[in-house]
Each structure stands twice: as C-alpha cells, then as structure tokens.
A protein has these predicted regions:
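Residues forming the flavin
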Residues: 1-53, 57-158, 162-530
Length: 530
C-alpha cells in the first residue's frame, strides 16, 4: 500500500477522478492501480473562486510499490497502525470514575484486557440523560446530577462531537477506528475536521458501554465518588454514594476521569490534601451568526455545496494588552445550549447534530486568563471564579435559567440590548436581553470587543452588529490540574490513583481525553503484570 500526499480533487470528484489523480501523481498507468481510498481530506478555501479538496490517498498497486515510491517524492509505503492489546495480570478489578471519553475508553481497554473494570458515573445513562436535558431546555427544570455536564458520554455528548485534536499521539487513530466500529460514520477516518454530531454520538456511546459489559465489566450509573481511603500513600478503597446509601469498595487502582465540572469532587480531593494546582483557562460568551452568511464568507460562490457542508472557521488574535482572543468549539449549523449543572448558576456551550443544518452557526469567543487573574492563590481559585461569573449570568437572565443575550453592536457600545436583528438566539429554555459587560470582568470585555473587531477583518461579517452573544462560556477547559507523575501517570502523592482526562487537566476535547484514558488503562495493565 502506498500513501500519496497532496492530491487535489474538485468538489465534484468521484472514484474515477481519484484514481486518475493518483496515477498522475505516481506517474503510472491507471491500470496499475488495484484500489485506492482517501486517507485524509481537508478543504482548501484560501481562494474563494477556486476551492478544492486537498487529500492524501492510500493506493494499492499491482506493480512494485517501492520502486514507484523512490521516483515520486509525494508518496511512501503506508504503515497501518495496529494497536497492541495487552492482557491483564493478577490484580483486583480497577475502578474508573467518570463515563466521559477518558473513562469510557479506559474502561474499554481494561475490559478487553480481561480486567473486569467497574465504571461508575454520577449521572444517568445517555437515554435518560437526554430526556433530563431536553426537559431542562424546555421547562428550565435543572437536574444537578443529570445534565449537559454529567451523565454517560460526558460533556462532549451535547456538543458538536468534534474529533479533531492537536495531539500527535498515534492512539488517536485507534480512537477514531473505535468510534467507527461502534457506529460512527466512516468519514471521520479521513476528514481533517471530523465530527459525529450529538445525535450519532449517543448511539456510539451506548455501543461502547455494551461491549464493556459483555466483556465482564460493570457499569454503575447514578453513583458518585465521595471519598477515598489511603494507607502509606497507597490507594486502598473508595467510598461511593448511590440511591441506596454509601458503600466502600476496596481497590488499589482507580482512574479518576471526572470531567471539568465535577467541582464538588475537586473540593473533596483538596480536602484529602491531594496535590492540585490552578491552571489557565478561558472565559467569554457564545457568538451566533446566520449559517448562510458564514457559509458565504468562507466559501463564496461555492456556499451550499453538499460536499462542503456548513462552513467552519477558527480565528485567533493576540492583543496589545498581552491577551489572546480566539474562537473555540465552532458549531456550523448548530445551536447554543444551556450547559448549566449547578443550582442558581448558568453557563453555555455549543452543539450540532450530524447534518449541521440549523439556521445559525456559533462558536465560543474566549479570552485566555491565567492564575494571576484569580482573586486568590488558592488551588481552586479558578473554579471559584467560574462559579462567580455563572452566578452573575443566572441573575442577569432572570434567575430562571434563561440566558443573558446581547447583540454585538450593543456589546461594543456597552448598552443593554432591547431588540434582535436578523439573528435569533437558539438557546433554551429562553433568553433575556442583557449587557454582558456587567457580567464578565472588565479585562475580558475589553479583550472580547477588540477581538470581535479584529476578527471581522479576518472573516467577513464576524463583527456583524446583529450577531448575538450569549453568556457565559466558562467551561471550555478545566480550571485545575491534579498533579501526576510523568512516567506512571499516577498521582504524585498516592500510588494507584490515576488523574485522567480533561477534568484532571491533561486533555482538551473528546479525542485527547480518550487517548489519555487509554494511556492510563495501559499503565494499570502493565503494573498488573509485574
């Protein structure tokens, strides 16, 4: 198999044109190609009048492939990634806390090793969780144990289901292949910016859970970690809270994949004197535009092309005040969702289904902040800042989980909005006209305003006065890092405790969290064989 890079394909390409382009690149006859398959595909939209797909194609030839590679600088022998599944040794069943991407993939790898893991999740299974979330979005009745943050699949379940990642870890291919084998569409294997969509992601998550159970694992929903027992700096047990009361489970290995919103767990870990440090994160708001205008700005006359789909964007700028402003978790053809999980506090996120065909497109507009901006040097000071901003957003929205919104023109002029333009907010249960300048810190407001203006020069219409800001976006990443060793991935203080994933400060998104879960599982399996 040869991997051929830099193949340019038109938007209306078919299998025949792919074969022809590969033959031209390799300088061979088309009949020499037995088969070809796109390995990676991205959109090159730098020239709006000449948009094309830039692809990498895997081709199988019926002639000597090594000779062909030597004469073609854009090709090499393709090496298929094969994951080495280890077997579990003689040790008690490990426990995985949290059924987000990190926890699910950790439990899956452990189950395949024969470890019979126990996966506990404070929220509900994805079907009951979906019903709880939909009820909240329509009625404002928040369930603090089952919501956008807590439940099977983690916070990423109600998102765009993005599967791109900055990590170069070879395990990310493993994660994508697992998603496909559990029901995700094949295109996530080759799209440069793959996404599943919240509708398809739910079924995939259930299939992973079912395999864990079939392999001997145990999955416990509505089960919350409330304490841990140590002796001589070694993990000995955990205490869980269920509907039937508290229970102590003896174990010497726990993967702590709790997610970025498990604030009461952060406080419990701090009380147990586990080493935790405050880390930088970002705050801001969701910004919402008409999808057709974003598509036009990105794709010009090609807007609406079915193969292109709804347009994505990723913008960033560095300001004179030293702060960075950037867009994050862009949801083409999606909606802004109420992601609240605590009583009397409100935060937002973005979500798309697989089709990405809703009226608006949105993204987070964020300002980077660091521990120097926090109100104290407490390890949980960033978390307390999040809570403060979310409490202010709750009050600004009317104290009923309606979200505070503001037109961009009004935000730039520091005045409360009184009407909408052509962009209608998509968030539920409802919204309240507000002035986000009165919710967010002054340094965030100033930076967001400057960023909007500068980004309007990068993407036509980004600074449209009728675009809608919805507040607040405060949970793009964890505000803490639970310290761990670089070699064993165990807590720097407690042997057998593995801080893992986004909540622990070691990932940022579905793929990187899943990869971290796999790595922690591998460490436990390795230790079981010593």
């Amino acid at each position: 198999m040869i991997r051929v890079n830099n193949i340019h394909l038109s938007l209306d390409y078919d299998d025949k044109s792919v074969r022809k382009a590969v033959a031209q690149q390799l300088r061979v006859e088309e009949k020499s190609i037995k088969s070809c398959k796109i390995f990676r595909r991205s959109v090159d939209a730098r020239k709006k009048d000449s948009i094309y797909f830039l692809t990498t194609v895997d081709a199988e030839l019926n002639i000597n492939e090594e000779k062909v590679c030597k004469k073609c600088g854009n090709a090499q022998i393709a090496r298929k990634y094969e994951y080495n599944q280890m077997k579990f040794g003689n040790a008690p069943s490990p426990i995985v806390v949290g059924a987000g991407p990190a926890g699910l993939f950790a439990a899956l790898i452990l189950a395949r090793s024969g470890a019979n893991p126990i996966l506990i999740e404070r929220g509900r299974d994805v079907d009951r969780r979906t019903a709880d979330v939909n009820r909240f979005w329509t009625s404002g009745q928040l369930d603090t144990t089952s919501n956008v943050q807590f439940g099977e699949g983690g916070a990423g379940t109600f998102s765009d289901g993005k599967l791109n990642s900055g990590t170069k870890d070879i395990r990310q291919r493993k994660v994508l292949e697992e998603f496909v084998s559990h029901g995700a569409p094949d295109e996530i294997l080759y799209n440069a910016k793959p996404h599943i969509g919240t509708d398809m992601l739910k079924g995939t998550i259930k299939n992973i859970r079912n395999e864990i159970i079939e392999l001997g694992g145990r999955v416990m929903f509505e089960t919350k970690l409330v304490s841990m027992g140590f002796s001589d700096n070694k993990l000995k047990s955990i205490t869980i809270e269920t509907k039937n009361g508290n229970e102590i489970i003896e174990t010497d290995n726990v993967i702590l994949a709790i997610g970025h919103s498990a604030r009461d767990t952060f406080e419990m870990l701090y009380d147990l004197k586990l080493p935790i440090e405050a880390k930088p994160f970002s705050v801001g708001a969701r910004i919402e535009h008409l999808r057709q205008k974003v598509d036009k700005a990105q794709y010009g006359r090609f807007a609406g092309n079915k193969k292109l789909g709804s347009a994505n964007y990723k913008l960033s700028t560095h300001l004179d005040n030293g702060r960075g402003v950037y867009t994050f978790c862009m949801c083409p053809g999606g909606k802004v969702v109420n992601a609240s999980s605590e009583k009397n506090r409100l935060c937002t996120n973005g979500m798309s289904e697989f089709a990405r065909n809703a009226e608006n497109s949105n993204s987070a507009l964020l300002v980077g902040i660091n521990p120097d901006d926090y109100e104290s040097d407490h390890p949980l000071a960033g978390m307390y800042l999040q809570r403060k901003l979310e409490s202010k957003a709750f009050v600004a929205g009317g104290e009923n989980y309606n979200a505070p919104i503001q037109r961009v023109d009004d935000f730039l002029n520091n005045r409360k909005s009184t009407h909408l333009g052509d962009v209608k907010p998509s968030i539920g249960p409802n919204y309240e006209f507000s002035n986000l300048n009165e919710i967010l810190p002054e340094y965030v407001n100033t930076s967001m305003a400057q960023g909007i203006v500068k980004m309007g020069r990068m993407l036509h219409g980004f600074d449209d006065g009728d675009a809608v800001l919805t507040g607040v976006e405060s949970r793009s990443s964890s505000p803490v890092r639970i310290m761990r060793k670089t070699d064993t991935l165990e807590s720097v203080l407690i042997e057998g405790l593995y801080p893992c994933g986004e909540g622990a400060g070691y990932a940022g998104g579905i793929i990187s969290a899943a990869v971290d879960g796999i790595k922690c599982a591998e460490k436990i399996i390795e230790k079981s064989n010593k």
